[in-house]
Regions:
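Bacterial Sec-dependent N-terminal signal peptides
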Residues: 1-30
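Exposed boundary/loop context
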Residues: 2, 14, 39-41, 45, ...
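Intrinsically disordered, low-complexity, compositionally biased regions/tails
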Residues: 11-13, 50-52, 154
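C-terminus-biased signal that marks the final domain/tail of proteins
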Residues: 27-147, 236-278, 283-407
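Internal mixed beta-strand/loop scaffold within catalytic domains of large alpha/beta enzymes
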Residues: 132-231, 244, 374, 378, ...
């Protein structure tokens, strides 16, 4: 199929999106999540292909179920034959060379998942491209779905460094949360990775005290041959030291506009990444020990043309009803109080907050809405790194702690 100059197929012009509104509370029914339900842990070890086989064998039924729901969601959103949409998306992009160059073991991991589940490699490959598919659809029309609120706090004498986020995803992923515990292998450190069955990464931490959380920045320029977000996350977490992790995030070509909050032992960093540049972001230049972000770029100006006007309104303060702006303001108000002790309890209170009921940081799963808090994650860095996470929104699920074996 012929491509346009940005590598996106012309078929997009025929798509008519049907996007449900996230905030139509009258049409949404809240679903209670059991507080006793924990995110299952799946142990992975060996090389990439072996890890993929283990992933698929452990979650074969769940992967079959969530792939079916994923395709139903695409069908609903596009009104087109879902297999045709996936095939056109696959042909319109060219991510494989970047994956093979920067994270070759992950390409083998996808082969292993396909082999052990019986799912086609094309389906397994495209399922990884959560943000990249949103970009593909956004080429035609902005669906208006905002996702994720995150922050990071550097270490002091009274507490270690933390990074944390509410990972907000589409409703069809509800119930398929998984925590991968990956053994160290061939120079790569031990890792804990939050994910969904069939997906290789959403965020995570390694045993050397390096962690990463992410936020979609749909407004930024994308690339049809860059490195996808899931692979960027795993690439960062494969590094043994901070210098290598920072070099990686700055060197690769990024497939999607994305904000990366990276914690390295005692320090925290925030980078807004687009196809053409990676820019470090400081919410307060006088306080580099605190970072926070939602879903609109604040320092990277590598914008898609159709976002220029709306971005001006957000940055000028005119768009005060913007979902991302409201959540960003909520984070700022909560995290910049002069008497904050930055205890774990404060982090949890922030992640559970609903300061604006229509635009909350914590999104309960509701039937009829598009997005919910898939999991809330607190990553503790330093000499004793760990992950705490919930199954779905943190107001309805308790945080469960997982620590590394040799720490």
């Amino acid at each position: 199929m012929e491509k346009n100059e940005n590598g996106f197929g012309y078929f997009l012009l025929s798509i008519i999106l049907i996007i449900p509104c996230e905030n139509l509370f009258s049409q949404a029914t809240e679903q209670l999540i059991s507080r006793n339900k924990e995110v299952p842990v799946v142990e992975l070890s060996g090389n990439g292909y072996q890890r993929g086989l283990q992933h698929g064998n452990a979650l074969k039924n769940e992967i079959g179920e969530v792939f079916k729901k994923w395709k139903e969601n695409i069908q609903l959103s596009t009104n087109l034959n879902v297999d045709s949409v996936i095939s056109m998306f696959y042909r319109a992009t060219n991510f494989e060379p970047a994956i093979k160059k920067w994270t070759p073991e992950l390409f083998e991991e996808l082969k292993g998942i396909s082999k052990s589940t019986g799912q086609s490699f094309k389906d397994v490959f495209c399922f990884q491209l959560v943000d990249e598919f949103w970009v593909y659809i956004d080429k035609l029309q902005n669906p208006g779905n905002d996702h994720c609120s995150g922050f990071g706090i550097a270490a002091t004498n009274s507490h270690p460094a933390y990074i944390a986020q509410n990972m907000d995803l589409e409703n069809f992923m509800n119930g398929y949360q998984v925590l991968f515990h990956i053994s160290s292998y061939n120079g790569e450190p031990e890792q804990y990775i939050l994910s969904c069955a069939g997906l290789i990464a959403l965020n995570g931490i390694n045993s050397d005290g390096i962690g990463v959380c992410v936020n979609t920045l749909m407004q930024l320029e994308a690339s049809s041959d860059g490195l996808p977000v899931a692979c960027v996350i795993r690439g960062i977490l494969s590094m043994q030291d901070g210098a290598s992790a920072l070099k990686f995030i700055k060197t690769i070509k990024h497939a999607s506009g994305q904000n990366y909050i990276i914690g390295i032992v005692d320090s925290v960093y925030d980078f807004e990444a687009s196809a053409n540049k990676v820019v470090r972001f400081f919410p307060d230049s006088n306080n580099p020990s605190l970072v926070y972000h939602t879903n609109h770029p604040l320092t990277n100006d590598d914008l898609k043309p159709w976002y220029l006007e709306s971005q001006k309104k957000i940055l000028s303060g005119e768009a005060k009803d913007n979902n991302s702006f409201i959540r960003f303001t909520s984070l700022k108000n909560r995290l910049t109080q002069p008497d904050n002790d930055f205890s774990v309890n404060l982090l949890k209170e922030t992640l559970r907050s609903k300061d604006n009921l229509l635009n909350p940081i914590c999104r309960v799963y509701k039937n009829g809405e598009a997005v919910f808090t898939f999991s809330s994650v607190i990553l503790t860095l330093g000499k004793s790194p760990s992950i705490q996470l919930t199954r779905a929104s943190p107001d309805q699920s308790e945080y469960v702690l997982h620590s590394f074996k040799n720490k």
